[in-house]
Amino acid sequence: MTDKRKDGSGKLLYCSFCGKSQHEVRKLIAGPSVYICDECVDLCNDIIREEIKEVSPHRDRSSLPTPHEIRHHLDDYVIGQEPAKKVLAVAVYNHYKRLRNGDTSNGIELGKSNILLIGPTGSGKTLLAETLARLLDVPFTMADATTLTEAGYVGEDVENIIQKLLQKCDYDVQKAQRGIVYIDEIDKISRKSDNPSITRDVSGEGVQQALLKLIEGTIAAVPPQGGRKHPQQEFLQVDTSKILFICGGAFAGLDKVIGQRINTGSGIGFGAVVKGQSEKATEGELLSQVEPEDLIKFGLIPEFIGRLPVVATLSELSEDALIQILKEPKNALTKQYQALFSLEGVELEFRDEALTAIAKKAMARKTGARGLRSIVEGVLLDTMYDLPSMDSVEKVVVDESVIAGQSAPMLIYGQPEAQASGE
């Protein structure tokens, strides 16, 4: 085909599909006795892309990894937390198996199993959810429960969560309905007391009520392309019963609630226990014994707990686990910085005692794995600032004294006589 504006007779030409003249479009492409404009070509491409999108979910469903494969993939990125990995692997496998079989098996309707993750800050809750979404190649979005309020109040509406998920997959509803939503800080929306209050709690119990139907499964009406709702608007209809919701929170103080329950009824007189079981147990051991009644006492309403039937607890990371996190996962922090330095043609080495010092510092901060990056970033900041302006640096070495703030990283130059310390 050739680009033509007029035929040999100089007659004005029109697109054979939309009827626009050659003056109304940028290009008019001619074939044997037919013309098509650039706008119609774009429209045809859009139609083909939409058909490809509709076919792709069926292809994805045929390759569902087994629980063992899911667990092994999580092992590549998340250190420790073995019980939580096992619970997540089974729950995620069952969820997507339910979707693949159309929510029923031999006429039996299969229930939805959303997940509640309980564990201290920096224990890997968010990373587990992100890694699962990457493995399954499904849309993933995160929401902060502390920003949510009931509809009609100042704050973020719970349906905005679905809007964010749609944005991640270019507003493809079918793809969004197979996605994963992670709601963080879910413990922060617990009601303020055990007893229901006559005053409205729009950011606590009110949000729990608003999330109920969304998590259980409803048809959410979402404005297309993120616009505001108005009566004459056409909405995108999203079935949330097919979306996997994972809620996570630190639940600070929940271990004490569990401890009180365990110690209740320990007896008096000859039947008394001198020291309660909970006083000897660690926080992680207590959290692993969590029951729905403990969560209710903490401030979650029974209906909300019922929508999160799968509960996985994560323990606080030990010093050894933090050292492993620094060097073993596929995207380990030390590997990330080594890759960053290699872009400058420089080798970065972390001595073993330096890794131990970083882990000890993170333990003291009580921020778990989340605090590791800020520590490493802090000790390497000056080096990363100066390195692009320096010549002949071949290697940077970080030892224990660097982490302690007693010296700067050692710089090793290409010429032996130019070896110097960055002090």
Curated annotation (Swiss-Prot):
GO MF terms here are: ATP binding; ATP hydrolysis activity; ATP-dependent protein folding chaperone; protein dimerization activity; unfolded protein binding; zinc ion binding
Q: Does the keyword Metal-binding apply?
A: yes
PROSITE patterns listed in its UniProt record:
CLPX_ZB
Entry keywords, A to Z: ATP-binding, Chaperone, Metal-binding, Nucleotide-binding, Zinc
Entry's Gene Ontology cellular component terms: HslUV protease complex
Which residues are recorded as binding ATP?
A: 120-127
Put simply, this protein is called ATP-dependent Clp protease ATP-binding subunit ClpX
